[in-house]
Amino acid sequence: MKRRWSHPGGKLRELGAEALTDAELLAILISSGIRGRSAEDIAREVLEKFGSLQGMANQPLEKFLEIKGLSDVKIIRIAAAFELARRLAKGG
């Protein structure tokens, strides 16, 4: 039987980050949804809008505000994660 988690953080804890989809990892950064939309729903919409994580990487923050359920705090959290990834990629 396939295990279901109520939030991808539980899946990460149990199986490791490698086992999560891009949408699930992004949902962890988004943290919570809004009425009628889970963090995973919002994450999937973000990925559909920008095509991929790479497509998201250089978007102006204002573009993310077009997505219902993304607040300034959530967008800043995503931007910080991308900056950390850039710095790691540069060997920092």
Which stretches of residues belong to each language-model region?
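Long, highly charged, low-complexity intrinsically disordered interaction regions
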Residues: M1-I67
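Structured, non-catalytic alpha/beta "coupling" segments that mediate domain-domain communication
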Residues: K74, A79-A85
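Basic, amphipathic DNA-recognition helix from helix-turn-helix-like DNA-binding domains
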Residues: L84-G92
